[in-house]
Amino acid sequence: MSSLSVFHVSSPDTPNKVLTHLEDIASTLGEHGVAFDRWEAAAPITPGASQEEVISAYRTQIDKLMTEHGYVTVDVISLNSDHPQKAELRAKFLEEHRHGEDEVRFFVAGRGLFTLHIDDYVYAVMCEKNDLISVPAGTRHWFDMGENPHFVAIRLFNNPEGWVANFTGEDIAGRFPRLED
């Protein structure tokens, strides 16, 4: 189940609130310019599927997002527990960073913990199949796929180069809950 846990930066062990209803999650994130919605991920995709398979299966949804929001680049991150670089990728994504452009993720299989650091609060969003999250440019965040990843996410960007992270050098991500496998 998708959820949102909101923490004050001074209390990483205890969330101020935990939300599980789509409307509550979307409203809370929307106050900070973050869009959260549910789309139907109808095509059967399994973690480990190739980028070409995923893009082909979801071409209609991808084209709609690219047209409506001006995204110019699409890629797919598709990982399962057998991926040879899972530890390196997890470590990279767990470092707090930001992008110079919006980042959109549409989860078409599995789950991941997308965590946002906004002012004095941390918003941990458990994203699952059918979840669409759009994070505005400049928002500090990190992503945890767990020790044994099992997810497929379509990522869209305004930048033709795709995923370009500007790491903050902060160690805040290590103080907050991780995705439990």
UniProtKB/Swiss-Prot annotation:
Superkingdom in the source lineage: Bacteria
Top EC category: oxidoreductase
Binding site for Fe(2+): 97, 99, 103, 141
Catalysed reactions listed for this entry: 1,2-dihydroxy-5-(methylsulfanyl)pent-1-en-3-one + O2 = 3-(methylsulfanyl)propanoate + CO + formate + 2 H(+); 1,2-dihydroxy-5-(methylsulfanyl)pent-1-en-3-one + O2 = 4-methylsulfanyl-2-oxobutanoate + formate + 2 H(+)
GO molecular function, one term: iron ion binding
The EC number(s) this enzyme carries: 1.13.11.54, 1.13.11.53
Cofactor remark from the record: Binds 1 Fe(2+) cation per monomer. Binds 1 nickel ion per monomer.
Complex and partners: Monomer.
Name recorded for this polypeptide: Acireductone dioxygenase
Organism in which the protein naturally occurs: Pseudomonas savastanoi pv. phaseolicola (strain 1448A / Race 6) (Pseudomonas syringae pv. phaseolicola (strain 1448A / Race 6))
